[in-house]
């Protein structure tokens, strides 16, 4: 796994690659350290970063209602309180 700034840049590149209407999980962004992906996103202040397209491994939301509203506006399907990953999961590339 890359370290430091390289890892951070790769995680952010992966987030930006998720198209509207789809989601990826923290584990997709950084399989060896999903929490690191969350920390990188939390410390990023780029208003254009589509942070709302990243969800937990079970499809639940980390941020809550604001995240849900943004995803619903993009047409992301839900099953109850979770994103329907069978329909909305995006396979990110650019290995971290």
Question: What annotation goes with each model-predicted range?
Answer:
Residues 1-96:
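Nucleic acid-binding interface residues in structured DNA/RNA-binding domains
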């Amino acid at each position: 796994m890359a370290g430091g700034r390289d890892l951070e840049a790769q995680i952010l590149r992966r987030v930006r690659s998720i198209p509207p209407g789809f989601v990826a999980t923290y584990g997709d962004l950084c399989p060896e350290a999903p929490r690191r992906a969350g920390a990188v996103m939390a410390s990023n202040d780029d208003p254009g970063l589509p942070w709302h397209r990243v969800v937990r491994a079970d499809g639940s939301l980390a941020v809550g209602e604001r995240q849900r509203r943004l995803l619903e506006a993009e047409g992301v399907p839900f099953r109850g309180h979770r994103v329907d990953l069978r329909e909305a999961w995006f396979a990110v590339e650019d290995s971290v």
